[in-house]
UniProtKB/Swiss-Prot annotation:
Modified residues (N6-(pyridoxal phosphate)lysine): K95
Record-linked InterPro entries: Trp_synth_b_CS, Trp_synth_beta, Trp_synth_beta/beta-like, TrpB-like_PALP, TrpB-like_PALP_sf
The protein's name: Tryptophan synthase beta chain
Summary of subunit composition and partner proteins: Tetramer of two alpha and two beta chains.
Gene name linked to the record: trpB
Organism name: Pseudomonas savastanoi pv. phaseolicola (strain 1448A / Race 6)
MF (Gene Ontology): tryptophan synthase activity
Length: 409
C-alpha cells in the first residue's frame, strides 16, 4: 500500500482505478451526464449545503451518538468498542442520509416522480419517507423473496404512500429489483428521478451516495476527538453494496494509522455457493452500470447471492470498495449467517440494542478481533440499522434450530 491519497477518486469518467464508470443504455447516457452536472453544481452551492444541514439536523436527527459499548467491551476483554449509532436516525438506518440528499437534488432538477430499488426495505422506507415529505409520487421495486421476509417494511412503505412493485424474475431479490428499476428509468427519463440506495450504479451515483453518507465518518472523527482526543485505531462496517461502510470509511482513508475492515455476508461459507461475498468469492465484471467485483459462474453469468440478511443479499459491491480492495487500503472479510446471528443475540443481551442482521455481521467481526487486541485500542463499529425488520427472520431461524436440536436428542 504505497498510495497516500485514497480520497481523490473518481476521475472525470467515474473510475476508481479500473472500477466504476458509466455502462448504461444510450437513452440513459444524457440523463446520467445531466445528473452529474447538476450534482457538481449542487455541491458548489451554499444554499444546497444549508438545506441539507437543516434536514439532517431537524428531520433525520443528526448528529447521532458515538456510544461506548461498555458491556460488550468487558465481554470481549480487549479493545474499547464504540458504536456509531446510525440506527437512531429517523427511519432506523443510515439510508435516510442519502435519501435526503438525492430528493433535494431531484427537487432542484424539477423531477416529479421518484423510483427506487430495495432489498431489506430500509432504503425503500427512507425513499417513501422523503417522497411523502416532499409530496412526490414514489414507486419502489422489491424482490418477491424480500417482500416475504420483510413484511413490516412493506407495510411501512405503503403507509407512507409508496407503490410497491413485486419483482418475480431471477431470485426475486435486490439484483432483480434494481434491474426493474433501471427499466422504469429508461422508459420515464424525462420526469423520473432514480434514487439509488447504495454506492453502485453508473457514475455519479457511487460518488454521490458516498458523499451523502460521509457525514457518518465526519461525525465519528469529531466525536472520537472529543471523547478520546485522537483518531480510532480501527473501523468496522458491514458491506453489501457498501454505502454505510463507505460513509464511515471515506473520511479516514488517508489516515494511515486507522485500520479499516469491511465485512461481507459469508452466508453458509465462501467455500459454498451460498454466500454474498463479492470480493472474497467473486471476479471483476459489469453490472448495473458499473465495473466491479461480482459473483459469476464460469461463463460470466451473474450467480445468485445468499445471506440471512436481505440488505447484504447482492451479487456485487460498490466500485470504490473494489478499488480499495485491490490497492489493499481496506481489508475485506466475511462472516457467516450463524456467526452474525450469534453476534445479534450478544448485542441484544449485553447492550440492550437490537441490531439489524446486516449490522450483526460487523459486530461478529468486531467481537472476533477485539478479544485479541489491547485495551487501549479504539474500535468503531457502524451500527447501520436497527433489527425491528428482522424479527420474523430471527424467530424462524430459532424455531428451525430448535426443531433440529429436538431431532438430535
Amino acid at each position: 500500500m504505497t498510495q497516500t491519497n485514497f480520497r481523490s477518486g473518481p476521475d472525470v469518467n467515474g473510475l476508481f482505478g479500473s472500477f466504476g464508470g458509466r455502462y448504461v443504455a444510450e437513452t440513459l447516457m444524457p440523463l446520467v451526464l445531466d445528473l452529474n452536472r447538476e450534482y457538481e453544481a449542487a455541491k458548489a452551492d451554499p444554499e444546497f449545503a444549508k438545506e441539507m444541514a437543516y434536514f439532517q439536523r431537524d428531520y433525520v436527527g443528526r448528529p447521532n451518538p458515538l456510544y461506548f459499548a461498555e458491556r460488550l467491551t468487558e465481554f470481549c476483554d480487549g479493545a474499547k468498542i464504540y458504536f456509531k449509532r446510525e440506527e437512531l436516525n429517523h427511519t432506523g438506518a443510515h439510508k435516510i442520509n442519502n435519501c435526503i440528499g438525492q430528493v433535494l437534488l431531484a427537487k432542484r432538477m424539477g423531477k416529479k416522480r421518484l423510483i427506487a430499488e430495495t432489498g431489506a426495505g430500509m432504503h425503500g422506507v427512507a425513499t417513501a419517507t422523503v417522497a411523502a415529505r416532499f409530496g412526490l409520487p414514489c414507486v419502489i421495486y422489491m424482490g418477491a423473496t424480500d417482500i416475504e421476509r420483510q413484511q413490516a417494511n412493506v407495510f411501512r412503505m405503503k403507509l407512507l404512500g409508496a407503490e410497491i412493485v413485486p419483482v418475480t424474475s431471477g431470485t426475486g431479490t435486490l439484483k432483480d429489483a434494481m434491474n426493474e428499476a433501471l427499466r422504469d428509468w429508461v422508459t420515464n427519463v424525462d420526469d423520473t428521478f432514480y434514487l439509488i440506495g447504495t454506492v453502485a450504479g453508473p457514475h455519479p451515483y457511487p460518488a454521490m451516495v458516498r458523499d451523502f453518507q460521509a457525514i457518518i465518518g465526519k461525525e465519528t472523527k469529531e466525536q472520537m476527538q472529543e471523547k478520546e482526543g485522537r483518531l480510532p485505531d480501527s473501523l468496522i462496517a458491514c458491506v453489501g453494496g457498501g454505502s454505510n461502510a463507505m460513509g464511515l470509511f471515506h473520511p479516514f482513508l488517508d489516515d494511515a494509522s486507522v485500520e479499516i475492515i469491511g465485512v461481507e455476508a459469508g452466508g453458509h461459507g465462501v467455500d459454498t455457493d451460498k454466500h454474498a461475498a463479492s470480493l472474497n468469492g467473486g471476479v471483476p465484471g459489469v453490472l448495473h452500470g458499473n465495473r466491479t467485483y461480482l459473483l459469476q459462474d464460469g461463463d460470466g453469468q451473474i450467480t445468485d447471492a445468499h445471506s440471512i440478511s436481505a440488505g447484504l443479499d447482492y451479487p456485487g459491491i460498490g466500485p470504490e470498495h473494489a478499488f480499495l480492495h485491490e490497492v489493499k487500503r481496506v481489508e475485506y472479510v466475511s462472516i457467516t449467517d450463524d456467526e452474525a446471528l450469534d453476534a445479534f443475540h450478544q448485542c441484544c443481551l449485553l447492550e440492550g440494542i437490537i441490531p439489524a442482521l446486516e449490522t450483526a455481521h460487523a459486530l461478529a467481526e468486531a467481537m472476533k478481533r477485539a478479544t485479541n487486541l489491547r485495551d487501549d485500542h479504539l474500535m468503531v463499529v457502524c451500527l447501520s440499522g436497527r433489527g425491528d425488520k428482522d424479527m420474523q427472520t430471527v424467530m424462524n431461524h430459532m424455531a428451525a434450530a430448535e426443531k433440529t436440536q429436538e431431532k438430535l436428542v
